[in-house]
Amino acid sequence: MDIRATEQTILNWTGETLALGIFEGATELTEELGELNERLGGTLQELITEEEFEAKTGTSAVTRLGKDSPIRKLILVGLGKPEDFKLHSLRNAAANIARSAKKLKIKTLGISLPVFNNAPTLTTGAIVEGVLLALHTDLRFKSEPEDKGAKLETVDLLGLAGQETAINQAQIICDGVILARELVNGPANSVTPITMAQTAETLASDYGLTLTILEQEDCEKLGMGAYLGVAKASDLPPKFIHLTYKPEGTPKRKLAIVGKSLTFDSGGLNIKVSGSGIETMKMDMGGGAATLGAAKAIAQLKPDVEVHFICAATENMISGKAMHPGDILTASNGKTIEVNNTDAEGRLTLADALVFAEQLEVDAIVDLATLTGACIIALGDDISGLWSPNEELATQLKTAAELAGEKFWQMPLEEKYFEGMKSPIADMKNTGPRAGGSITAALFLKQFIKETPWAHLDIAGPVWTDKEGGINNTGATGFPVRTLVNWVLS
């Protein structure tokens, strides 16, 4: 698909289908819309009147035009009230347009949406993201493709001439999001620690990244007892993935992104029972998938920042070699952990990954993980939890998320709650009381960071959706690749 920035407007563009965004309360046609209505022989006003189109957020209306018209079809999308208009409103409007175009089997499309906050570059990026991410469907495991018939070939962004760089950047970021989506969507017999390592190898080869993969023996030498305690039950070997992007010159700063990478989580000997969603546990590597997706985008965007991407990939399985409830593991920083629940395994893998990341002497570390159901109970499916003892880093991430339209809510690191994590026979347990479970999980991870500014993102809710909406289709969302990329670029 060719996405083009053009100086043409709704008054002189010709093509198969024109899509317009209209604000609620602005359905009386004046100025440019009035001129367009005349150009289309009154069809625009007829569509608004006959469909009783009020331009509420998420609504749309479609009509066909006469054979003599310079445009064959017209799509209207509602933008809601002007005072509620945000950058993400553009993404959702573009997604709405893209789905309508797909349903109508449109080949050429002109999109006219308002410029957000006098920022054509941000506007262009948001529209491109909305179109590309809404059109992405993962059909790799279908025996016969369901997408038949004509497909969208050309999209003209009207009134946005000169924004080719913004289009290219948005396409690169979307490629990273789609990589993350497809890794999470892939079943556990397709996406394994081995294939995650192979994906990292492909990224390194294609985009000039440096790759180190630590095998089990390497991890043993580094004392990664927490990570290996989880990994030992699986017949598949663990793969500790370390990708590095380095700019050509001296980096302005050094960052580490650490993604939880459990390619399947059975719960271990504390097995997930029927009704616990065990069949969805292929998504438990959503943090690692987003880490690799961000790596793909950042390697092509080439910021003046050194970035380390770390995925401690493994499965959490059941076998005669599995860790037992009550086992004591020693992490690579020497701290001991009493395992009182083998289904709280992600934090064990992250413990050694965080120690490894800090030893790289980076300026900041962000970990992301589908870590707790408690975070979903607290914040729902659409909002990720954010914990950080460093307010500057937390603010950077929230700003990056706002730009991406990805939702985060900063949660407290209530130190008192760690009392419930203390063990009489080890330095700590891996779970605490039920209350405040997402907070105690973050406090557990905090024990493996000494001084480096650090943030923890619990993405258990937003990494997956069971319903189509906005830029997301059913399945993996690729959350929060765009936030991570924005953070690095900032």
From Swiss-Prot:
Alphabetical GO biological process terms: proteolysis
E.C. number(s) listed in UniProt: 3.4.11.1, 3.4.11.10
Gene Ontology MF annotations: manganese ion binding; metalloaminopeptidase activity
Gene3D superfamilies: Leucine Aminopeptidase, subunit E, domain 1, Zn peptidases
Swiss-Prot/TrEMBL catalytic activity: Release of an N-terminal amino acid, Xaa-|-Yaa-, in which Xaa is preferably Leu, but may be other amino acids including Pro although not Arg or Lys, and Yaa may be Pro. Amino acid amides and methyl esters are also readily hydrolyzed, but rates on arylamides are exceedingly low; Release of an N-terminal amino acid, preferentially leucine, but not glutamic or aspartic acids
Keyword RNA-binding appears in the UniProt entry: no
List of residues binding Mn(2+) 2: 260, 265, 284, 345
Chief location of this protein within or outside the cell: cytoplasm
Name the record gives this protein: Probable cytosol aminopeptidase
Organism phylogeny: Bacteria, Bacillati, Cyanobacteriota, Cyanophyceae, Oscillatoriophycideae
Gene that this sequence comes from: pepA
